[in-house]
From Swiss-Prot:
Subcellular location: Plastid
Pfam families linked: DUF613
Naturally occurring in which organism (per UniProt): Euglena longa (Euglenophycean alga)
Domain of life per record: Eukaryota
Family the UniProt entry places it in: Belongs to the A.longa ORF167/ORF288 family.
Name of the featured protein: Uncharacterized 25.9 kDa protein in rpl12-rps7 intergenic region
Length: 211
């Protein structure tokens, strides 16, 4: 099941916290036993109340996770993509990461380099790039520990793998026929790839007119 509308105000998920909660889920019963024994030994009521409140808090978090089927991640911001890779990355022909090499980054930070401005991506184009690079914004809690293996249903192109494993490409240009986030997110699209004379990989994303 995939959502057809993306709410940009989705909650931010703390993966480390959820991992800890999952571990505590399996050891909560022995912790309660230890806590019961400790209660007989520890005479300080402040420590007792602190431990009790913390266990109660963690137990409530477990209940929330067990009753909640999905979690949502927030798309990366513009600043993330501008420093993302040493290879040029484009969306609809617009260059995202102007500073391409380590040497250029150092020179830019030292004020020895002037970056030529190019047309900026729209907010929706950043969302589409994030969607194709990192996968769905909606994921099941049961898959949270292997979220890197999850891709969008019905065949979203894993451009991240292509980008990292193929040194022959100097860059990638992700071209959308239409920025229809609803159809793309629900898998109603197909892709076509070709390589330019400059060794730039073009990935065209076409919207399916019929299901």
């Amino acid at each position: 099941m995939f959502i057809y509308y993306i709410n940009m105000k989705t909650e931010k998920t703390n993966y480390i916290e959820i991992l800890i909660i999952k571990l505590i889920f399996f050891i909560l019963t022995p912790i309660k036993i230890i806590f019961f024994i400790a209660k007989k030994i520890i005479k300080n009521p402040i420590i007792y109340r602190f431990i009790f409140k913390y266990l109660l808090y963690m137990q409530n978090k477990i209940i929330i996770i067990n009753n909640k089927e999905y979690f949502y991640r927030i798309p990366k911001k513009k600043e993330y993509w501008e420093w993302f890779s040493a290879k040029p990355l484009y969306v609809n022909g617009k260059l995202i990461n102007e500073i391409k090499t380590k040497e250029q980054r150092i020179n830019f930070s030292l004020g020895k380099m002037i970056i030529k401005e190019s047309e900026s991506l729209t907010e929706l184009e950043y969302v589409l790039l994030d969607l194709f690079w990192f996968g769905p914004f909606q994921m099941k809690y049961q898959n949270i520990l292997r979220q890197n293996d999850i891709i969008i249903k019905k065949g979203v192109k894993n451009i991240k793998k292509i980008f990292q494993e193929n040194n022959k490409f100097k860059g990638i240009n992700l071209i959308f026929q239409k920025t229809d986030i609803c159809k793309i997110y629900s898998g109603k699209f197909y892709t076509y790839e070709r390589i330019t004379e400059d060794n730039i990989l073009l990935i065209y994303v076409f919207i399916k007119n019929k299901d």
